[in-house]
């Protein structure tokens, strides 16, 4: 082996550095494998603990930092289903059900908005006049109908898709009718 290759081989065999940071620490691989993460993303529609915390579930309350100090955001990666089975001995049945619910596919999905008949009538009337309302109209509707503006925006998107679908179906039925009458003649 040439001297330069021997030097390269010796460099690869050198002892690991004792830096204050490492790939394992950055990735969180140096933590205990069977610990449960305390931080959860803020999803008020999915919170299982009450405001008092008396229902048995632990709630983590983080105080606000002093003004002028900012912290990097914590990214919560979903735990794989197979790791959930490791924790079955440590949690009660209700806690396991809650954990499984969190691990399911709909974890971050918000609940479906149930519009009242009055809200639908108002939205339909506005849609007949303008199927692309601007932000000012949507915010005004949100205030009048006691809804969030983004829910109104989604309603209009869905309503436009429904109109497009029904228009496409009517075009198909007209073409089918014309085709059938031409065959009979």
Curated annotation (Swiss-Prot):
The Gene Ontology biological process annotation of the record reads: pituitary gland development
What lineage is on file? Eukaryota, Metazoa, Chordata, Craniata, Vertebrata
Per the record, DNA-binding region residues lie at: 108-167
Q: Self-association or partners: how does it assemble?
A: Can form heterodimers with PROP1 in binding to DNA. Interacts with TLE1.
Q: Name one GO cellular component term.
A: nucleus
* Full protein name: Homeobox expressed in ES cells 1
Q: Does the keyword Hydrolase apply?
A: no
The gene name on file is: HESX1
List cystine links: none
Species whose genome carries this gene: Pan paniscus (Pygmy chimpanzee)
Keyword set includes Nucleus: yes
Role description = Required for the normal development of the forebrain, eyes and other anterior structures such as the olfactory placodes and pituitary gland. Possible transcriptional repressor. Binds to the palindromic PIII sequence, 5'-AGCTTGAGTCTAATTGAATTAACTGTAC-3'. HESX1 and PROP1 bind as heterodimers on this palindromic site, and, in vitro, HESX1 can antagonize PROP1 activation.
Task: Please state where this protein is localized.
Answer: Nucleus
